[in-house]
């Protein structure tokens, strides 16, 4: 009879150390002296492995020697297909002890083809200068094909590694590279962020001690992918760095059954869980008409938000749906960050819930000023406060002339601090473009400050400029999403394309079937709404369901949609 698995406990008899370690390996060495650890769940929400930090450390050390036995040298890159399972976690930490540079990479998407995925990972492996690829057992054939195509020295699963030959493990220092994080961007020319141990540990301190104010009684849970910074750092490395137990649910499980996340939060009395806005929206939609009797969210004290633009209506719907199950709107915590800063740059105060500024969109577009909207204005929009910069980190908002703007002045956001990257991997040109010699990083985001807190209004690369107006594509998208019957969040994508005498606004709309008349009516409804509400003449094109591309964190990728449109992917 198979022994029943027991999850690792929440509580520990040790005093919490808030990531005050020089390296990630030393953080795991300390975590291994206690009882806490990682619990890994199946697509159906069943526990498949309990991995105490003590066991993880022992297995990672053995695997580190096995990696060195295939000829890997200290500093070599290792491509890891980031399945949410014990083997990925073991492989990642084996790389740490071996002095190798793990580069987590995405799994294939349900709608993606084999050939496209193999080409994508081959490109990423080349960009990472990896000569080793390790993947999950379920993708072993694909891994072998990628290895052959990319000319890798080793491509397989952990079981394929040779036996431990007793190789000596290197001494790891704070200056050593820790891992390679691919930021969202072109899959043909991907950009890897080189994160060193000292930057990672600085961010883990800021997140666990200052942002989340972790307690010994805390427990985290996540469905976020481990190849994305919010999943990897936020819910694997940060919990480990403060000896917190974490429960990991595969991303695919959440996408198919989002209420598994809610159920597991209640079942394991989790206190910390994060999601982009769309995750909360999906849960609120799926729970409609269902009983809340088996859900208990009363322990959830930090319901974090990150990874996409924060939208208030879906979050209000989530509160309304789950308040009867004990969820408090005071649990919401807005945050701001990016892979180039390891993960987090700012976090809103705990226990206060979402705080928003309701702004006059016309003044925002015309004057780049954050001015309160008049009562009852149709051109008003809420923007969430994402808190002040984390301790030892700094955020500035600069105008086109490079000068720091006063509060409520909207401009480009720059960041500085111990968590900011030292460079992109093997890409000095891109590094020089975004990172100044004095350490200030051009984030590529636009926003403003109010009472010392940062507010994000959008991405600079997405901004649509028409007749001197700065138009945010999400304003157009959200108007259509919210007001056109049959459209859901994420069904609309807006961007500008070059044209004469000025750029043309294109709006792609995911349409689910319908005859010719109903499709024509949908196009006209969207165009009329954007014309009357925003004063924008848009070319509206209907595309198929699931046709709009997403980033690794599940948010809409306007840049990929624009590239596909210009390439004729969506037809004439």
Swiss-Prot record:
Fetch the Pfam families from UniProt. AMP-binding (PF00501)
Which InterPro entries would you find in this protein's record?
A: AMP-bd_C_sf, AMP-dep_synth/lig_dom, ANL_N_sf, FAAL/FAAC
EC main class here is ligase
GO process annotations (BP): fatty acid biosynthetic process; sphingolipid metabolic process
Q: Does the keyword Repeat apply?
A: no
Null mutant: what phenotype? Deletion mutant cannot form bacterial ceramide. Mutants are impaired in growth at elevated temperatures but are resistant towards the antibiotic polymyxin B.
Question: Which key words are in the record?
Answer: Ligase, Lipid metabolism
Q: In which pathway does it act?
A: Lipid metabolism; sphingolipid metabolism
State whether keyword Cell membrane applies: no
EC code(s) of this entry: 6.2.1.-
The source's superkingdom equals Bacteria
Which molecular function terms from Gene Ontology are attached? adenylyltransferase activity; ligase activity
Which is one Gene Ontology cellular component term of this protein?
Answer: plasma membrane
Q: Which CDD domains match?
A: FAAL
Briefly, what is this protein's role?
Involved in de novo bacterial ceramide synthesis.
Q: Which family does it belong to?
A: Belongs to the ATP-dependent AMP-binding enzyme family.
| Protein name per its UniProtKB record | Putative acyl-CoA synthetase CCNA_01223
């Amino acid at each position: 009879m198979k022994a029943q698995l027991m999850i690792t406990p929440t509580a520990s008899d040790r005093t919490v150390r808030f990531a005050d370690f020089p390296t990630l390996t030393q953080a795991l060495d300390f975590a291994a002296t206690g009882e806490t650890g990682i619990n890994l769940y199946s697509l159906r929400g069943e526990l498949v492995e309990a991995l105490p930090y003590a066991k993880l450390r022992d297995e990672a050390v053995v695997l580190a020697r096995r990696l060195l036995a295939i000829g890997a040298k200290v500093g070599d890159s290792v491509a890891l297909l980031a399945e949410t399972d014990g083997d990925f976690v073991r492989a990642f930490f084996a790389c740490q002890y071996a002095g190798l540079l793990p580069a987590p990479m995405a799994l294939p998407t349900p709608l993606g083809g084999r050939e496209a995925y193999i080409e994508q990972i081959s490109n990423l492996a080349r960009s990472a200068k990896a000569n080793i690829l390790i993947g999950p057992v379920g993708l072993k054939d694909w891994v072998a094909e990628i290895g052959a195509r990319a000319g890798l020295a080793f491509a397989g699963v952990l079981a394929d590694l040779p036996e431990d030959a007793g190789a000596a493990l290197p001494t790891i220092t704070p200056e050593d590279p820790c891992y390679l994080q691919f930021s969202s961007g072109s899959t043909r020319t991907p950009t890897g962020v080189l994160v060193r141990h000292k930057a990672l540990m600085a961010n883990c301190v800021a997140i666990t001690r200052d942002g989340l104010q972790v307690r010994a009684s805390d427990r985290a849970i996540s469905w976020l992918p481990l190849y994305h910074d919010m999943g990897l750092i936020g819910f694997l490395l940060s919990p480990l760095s403060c000896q917190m137990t974490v429960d990991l649910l595969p991303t695919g499980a959440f996408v198919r059954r989002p209420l598994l996340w809610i159920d597991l939060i209640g079942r394991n009395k989790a206190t910390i869980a994060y999601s982009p806005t769309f995750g909360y929206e999906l849960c609120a939609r799926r729970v409609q008409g269902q009983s809340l009797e088996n859900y208990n969210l009363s322990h959830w004290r930090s319901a974090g938000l990150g990874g996409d633009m924060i939208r208030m209506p879906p979050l209000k719907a989530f509160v309304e749906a789950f308040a009867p199950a004990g969820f408090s709107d005071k649990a919401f915590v807005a945050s701001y960050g990016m892979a180039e800063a390891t993960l987090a740059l700012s976090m809103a105060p705990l226990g206060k819930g979402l705080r928003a500024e309701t702004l006059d969109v016309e003044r925002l577009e015309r004057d780049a000023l954050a001015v309160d909207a008049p009562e009852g204005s149709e051109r008003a929009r809420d923007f969430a406060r994402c808190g002040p910069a984390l301790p030892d980190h700094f955020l500035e908002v600069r105008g086109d002339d490079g000068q720091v703007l006063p509060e409520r002045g909207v401009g480009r956001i720059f960041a500085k601090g111990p968590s900011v990257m030292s460079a992109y991997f093997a890409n000095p040109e891109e590094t020089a473009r975004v990172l100044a010699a004095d350490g200030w990083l051009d984030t590529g985001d636009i926003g403003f400050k109010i009472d010392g807190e940062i507010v994000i209004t959008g991405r600079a690369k997405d901004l649509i400029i028409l007749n001197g107006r700065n138009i945010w594509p999400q304003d157009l998208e959200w108007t259509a999403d919210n007001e056109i019957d049959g459209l859901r969040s994420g069904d609309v994508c807006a961007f500008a394309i070059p044209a004469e005498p000025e750029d043309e606004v294109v709006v792609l709309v995911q349409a689910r079937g319908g005859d010719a008349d109903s499709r024509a009516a949908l196009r006209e409804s969207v165009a009329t709404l954007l014309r009357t509400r925003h004063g924008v003449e848009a070319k509206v094109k209907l595309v198929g369901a699931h046709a709009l591309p997403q980033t690794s964190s599940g948010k809409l990728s306007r840049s990929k949609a624009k590239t596909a449109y210009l390439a004729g992917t969506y037809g004439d």
